[in-house]
């Protein structure tokens, strides 16, 4: 793959994996970080805005605290994160300061990108940092996040940040140098894929486990991140960060996989809906409702066959077809209890069941994003309708 001019992008989000930044015995890899910051400073001097999503708080904290390799309890992980976050923020501040740059730490939880009001507030804060020429250094707030309310990996967090901020490139740096047809450590015949035009089910199937002990992510989470990013019009690169100056290495043509952005990205409001990581519930629809959605119509109760989960009006729900495949997400107009009551009913019968005059649509088309497992419309046909071309 020929070199990519990173300075040709307007706003770049760089995600750094824990294993790149932290050595279990020695702690923070300061020389590696210094070389990366040199790259960042060079990009910024060329006019490119840079956001950093930095893993490593727990890994660094457990090294500082001498917690070893054993599996940590939740409270131990959170304590390690508390120690690691301070050390990590100080390291970023010091290295960026060598170039006269200011860093701003932003710690987020799942709710900061999944709840609309907090999403807008987080976006405004980071936008202000960028306007002030500061470098946002973003991480999940592992001191308060629990397994039930967390991203679970910084790949998807980075994709949410990149799309939230309208970035045009996301770079995932880790200990893998791109996408292969199979995990190369297990299959010597695995072939490297330099460019991905669209994240199809076949591409998703290539996502084997590629996580190291110090990181939580693997190739599957990187492909999940790619679905979020590319659907919103953000290109993505998966590259190895093992070499010092990894961004310069990408520009020199080091092995990396480029995921092209969708040619028809969804607008900002729908980007937020489509990128929701944890839908509150699922609504199963019949083929007639699917045809209507593909024609740009709203989802009416008559086409709903099942309702799963506990959700409130305004929550994001996944919409699945008769085979159980997710074909879209949207903001539901009813809470779960009422949705169950009116599933399958004609619009004129709803008021008699609920006892009040209600909305005609279960999910209005303005609050709906069609997206298959690939982040694009599904490549299949439903009774003569070409979903891929709809």
UniProtKB/Swiss-Prot annotation:
Its main location: cytoplasm. GO terms for biological process: L-proline biosynthetic process. It catalyses: L-glutamate + ATP = L-glutamyl 5-phosphate + ADP. It is found in: Cytoplasm. Keywords: Amino-acid biosynthesis, ATP-binding, Cytoplasm, Kinase, Nucleotide-binding, Proline biosynthesis, Transferase. It holds the Pfam family PUA. GO terms for molecular function: ATP binding; glutamate 5-kinase activity; RNA binding. Catalyzes the transfer of a phosphate group to glutamate to form L-glutamate 5-phosphate. InterPro entries: AceGlu_kinase-like_sf, Asp/Glu/Uridylate_kinase, G5K_ProB, Glu/AcGlu_kinase, Glu_5kinase, Glu_5kinase/COase_Synthase, Glutamate_5-kinase_CS, PUA. Substrate binds at residues 55, 142, 154. It is an enzyme of class 2 (transferase). This is Glutamate 5-kinase. Belongs to the glutamate 5-kinase family. The keyword Repressor does not apply. The gene is proB. Residues 280-357 form the PUA domain. ATP binds at residues 15, 174-175. Its EC number is 2.7.2.11. One of its GO terms (cellular component) is cytosol. Signal peptide: none annotated. Pathway: Amino-acid biosynthesis; L-proline biosynthesis; L-glutamate 5-semialdehyde from L-glutamate: step 1/2.
């Amino acid at each position: 793959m020929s070199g990519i001019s990173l300075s040709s992008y307007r706003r770049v989000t760089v995600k750094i994996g824990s294993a790149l930044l932290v050595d279990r015995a020695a702690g923070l890899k300061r020389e590696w970080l210094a070389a990366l910051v040199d790259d960042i400073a060079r990009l910024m001097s060329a006019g490119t805005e840079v956001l950093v999503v930095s893993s490593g708080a727990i890994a660094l904290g457990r090294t500082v605290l001498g917690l070893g390799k054993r599996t940590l309890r939740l409270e131990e992980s959170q304590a390690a994160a508390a120690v690691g976050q301070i050390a990590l923020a100080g390291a970023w501040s010091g290295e960026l300061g060598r170039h006269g740059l200011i860093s701003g730490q932003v710690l987020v939880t799942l709710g900061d990108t999944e709840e609309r009001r907090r999403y807008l507030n987080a976006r405004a804060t980071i936008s202000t940092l960028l306007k002030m020429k500061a470098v946002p250094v973003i991480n999940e707030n592992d001191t308060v996040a629990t397994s039930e309310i967390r991203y679970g990996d910084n790949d998807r967090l980075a994709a949410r940040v990149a799309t939230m901020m309208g970035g045009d490139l996301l770079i995932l740096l880790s200990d893998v140098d791109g996408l292969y047809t199979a995990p190369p450590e297990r299959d010597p015949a695995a072939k490297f894929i330099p460019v991905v035009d669209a994240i199809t089910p076949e591409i998703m199937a290539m996502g084997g486990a590629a996580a190291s002990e110090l990181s939580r992510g693997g190739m599957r989470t990187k492909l999940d991140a790619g679905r979020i990013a590319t659907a919103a019009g953000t290109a993505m690169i998966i590259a190895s960060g093992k070499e010092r100056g990894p961004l310069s290495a990408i520009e020199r043509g080091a092995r990396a996989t480029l995921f092209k952005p969708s040619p028809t990205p969804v607008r900002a409001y729908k980007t937020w809906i489509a990128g929701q990581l944890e839908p509150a519930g699922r609504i199963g629809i019949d083929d007639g409702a699917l045809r209507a959605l593909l024609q740009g119509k709203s989802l009416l109760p008559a086409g709903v066959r099942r309702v799963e989960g506990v959700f409130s009006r305004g929550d994001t729900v996944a919409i699945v077809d008769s085979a159980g495949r997710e074909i879209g997400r949207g903001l539901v107009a009813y809470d779960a209890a009422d949705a169950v009551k009116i599933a399958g009913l004609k619009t004129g019968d709803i008021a008699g069941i609920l006892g009040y005059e209600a909305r005609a649509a279960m999910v209005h088309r303005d609050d709906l994003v069609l997206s298959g497992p690939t982040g694009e419309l599904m490549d299949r046909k439903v009774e003569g309708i070409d979903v891929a071309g709809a």
